[in-house]
Design a protein with these regions (language model features):
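Catalytic cysteine-centered active-site loop
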Residues: 1-23
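Aromatic- and glycine-rich peptidoglycan recognition patches
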Residues: 16, 33, 38-84
C-alpha cells in the first residue's frame, strides 16, 4: 500500500529524471528545511510545461507549474510509483 507520510512516499517506487516524467508520476519538494522532503504533487501534464496537483495548506487542492520559481527552487526528485 502507499505510505501515508510524504518522506516515506518518496521511497516508494522508482526514482526518475526530469526527462522521464509522465502523467501520474509524483514530484517531491522541500518546502521547509532545505533538502528535507515535506511536500508531494501528482503530475497531470508533462508538455510543454510540467503541471501538478497538490494540496496547499492555505489554498486547498490546486494546480501549479514546475516552472514557477517557488517550486523549481524547492524540487527534490520525481518518483514513478507504479510500473506502466
Amino acid at each position: 500500500s502507499i505510505p501515508r507520510v510524504t518522506v516515506d512516499q518518496a521511497k516508494f517506487g522508482e526514482e526518475i529524471s526530469l526527462n522521464e516524467v509522465q502523467i501520474g508520476d509524483w514530484v517531491f519538494f522541500a518546502t521547509g528545511q532545505v533538502g528535507l522532503i515535506s511536500h508531494v504533487g501528482l503530475i497531470i501534464k508533462e508538455k510543454p510545461d510540467i503541471v501538478f496537483i497538490h494540496a496547499s495548506t492555505k489554498n486547498g487542492v490546486r494546480e501549479d507549474r514546475l516552472s514557477q520559481k517557488y517550486y523549481k527552487d524547492r524540487l527534490v526528485k520525481f518518483i514513478r510509483p507504479f510500473k506502466n
